[in-house]
Regions:
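Substrate-binding cleft of carbohydrate-active enzyme catalytic domains
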Residues: 200-214, 218-221, 254-263
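Short, contiguous, pocket-lining structural segments
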Residues: 190-197, 213-221, 225, 250
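Alpha-helix-loop-beta-strand connector modules within alpha/beta enzyme cores
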Residues: 191-206, 225-235
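Bacterial N-terminal signal peptides
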Residues: 8-16
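Distinct, well-ordered alpha-helical segments
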Residues: 154-158, 221-230
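The start of beta-strands in P-loop NTPase/AAA+ ATPase cores
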Residues: 37-39, 208-210, 231-232, 344
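N-terminal hydrophobic targeting/anchoring segments and the immediately downstream early-domain regions
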Residues: 20-192, 241, 245-410
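Positively charged n-region of N-terminal signal peptides that target proteins for export
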Residues: 1-4
Length: 410
């Protein structure tokens, strides 16, 4: 009798395992079909820092880094916003000139890399560009600027960067600048939000049709931006403070205000912004050793900074327990339940710390879609999350800029 029961149990378990495998195969097949049909967009990667190396080519499948065109194709990712990241430094004329030159050089590196891989990718400057390039089968390269520091105190720089292809500026980074306060400046607030010059920057971005990015900025600066901007704004790589306490994330009130503005939060798949990190003394010791080795990352050359950043993230990824795809989709769920499906997207922060269990680079992006399908999201909802919402915001910025230009007779 026991033998018969054991046999029945084995048969039932085999059917259960087979059913699960069949279900996962169906999900994978459906995800492939969806990704071929819709426009998929990641609004933030820091890969341009790697382009400063002469040997880094977006057109080949690299062993290091998280983003290149072959892996974008593998992961079903059509479009990437390549962020020109400039760390905060001194605020004086000499530094502003140096930062301007670095920004232009990085922009040129993006152009050069896309041009030499023109059979695989093309730069996009408008929503229509993105959908046209999608139809051609090529990858799409948008440009953003992370940190308003390269603007310095010169408002004309905003248009100059727009003319060079940048379609958003993250107003600050880890420290305060002349535009606004950062959410993570150790010295606290300097402007109590957005400075008077920052208000001019936001208005100029509105005039041009350039998206204002509120990731990294302080809560007070966020509310000031919302009050100042006449166009929908974005949080290019932030998550939900209700699920993970971090000044880099948006709380529920901010999300409600973002909805009223018509904007979108692009959920950041950087582990510490999705799930509170567990205390790990070994990890902290290793990271402190790297901070000490590299003078707390201050006064470094570009090569030294890149080496320090690489060592830092290698150690962090080795010794910490990463958040999962499920954790990331929990944040998407939270936004959808609180303010609706029209205000959420994905901003990986790849090559800047982004990467979670199951999605360590762009080749694994479909795993997010798999989890969305498991939770019952429809094709149309997935289309909005993966690109429809951010393209709506960009188009609205384009439209309002055009209307402003026509009213001004220019």
């Amino acid at each position: 009798m026991k033998r018969k029961l054991s046999l029945v149990l084995i048969i039932l378990l085999s059917f259960a395992f087979s059913s699960c495998e069949d279900q996962e195969a169906r999900i994978a097949k459906k995800a492939d079909k969806i990704h071929k049909a819709i426009l998929t967009v990641d609004t933030h990667c820091d890969t341009p820092m790697r382009l400063m190396r002469s040997d880094f080519n977006l057109g080949v499948r690299n062993e290091d880094g998280c983003v290149d065109f072959p892996r974008m194709e593998e992961g079903g990712l059509d479009a990437e916003f390549f962020a020109v990241f400039i760390g905060q430094g001194p605020r004086n004329p000499e530094a502003y000139n140096e930062v301007y030159e670095r920004t232009v050089e990085t922009l040129e590196k993006i152009y050069d890399n896309v041009e030499k891989n023109s059979d695989m990718a093309e730069l996009a400057f408008t929503v229509d560009d993105a959908y046209r390039i999608k139809k051609s089968g090529k990858r799409i390269a948008f440009i953003g600027i992370e940190n308003g520091y390269p603007v310095g105190k010169d408002l004309s720089k905003v248009k100059e960067y727009y003319d060079m292809g940048a379609r958003y500026i993250t107003l600050s980074h880890s420290s305060n600048n002349d535009i606004c306060d950062s959410s993570t400046d150790e010295g606290g607030a300097e402007h109590d939000g957005l400075s008077e010059f920052g208000q001019q920057v936001v208005k100029e971005m509105n005039r041009l049709g350039m998206m204002v990015d509120v990731s990294h900025i302080s809560d007070e600066a966020f509310y000031d931006v919302i009050e100042t901007s006449t166009s929908p704004v974005i949080a290019s790589h932030s998550s939900c403070r209700a699920l993970c306490e971090s000044p880099r994330n948006l709380d529920d009130d901010m999300l409600m205000v973002l909805k009223d503005n018509g904007g979108v939060i692009q959920i950041c798949i950087l582990s510490n912004y999705l799930k509170q990190p567990e205390l790990n003394p070994v990890l902290e010791q290793k990271l402190n050793e790297i901070r000490e080795k590299y003078n707390d990352f201050e006064g470094l050359s570009e090569e030294e900074f890149e080496r320090a950043r690489r060592e830092y993230y290698e150690v962090r990824n080795k010794y910490r327990k990463l958040a999962t795809v499920e954790d990331a989709v929990d944040h998407i769920d939270h936004v959808v339940q609180l303010i609706g499906i029209d205000h959420v997207g994905i901003g990986s922060d790849f090559d800047g710390g982004g990467g979670i269990e199951g999605v360590m680079d762009v080749s694994q992006m479909k795993n997010i879609t798999h989890e969305l399908l498991r939770r019952g999201y429809t094709r149309n909802e997935i289309e909005k999350i993966w690109g429809g919402n951010i393209m709506r915001v960009l188009r609205e910025n384009e439209k309002l800029a055009q209307e402003t230009s026509e009213e001004a007779g220019t």
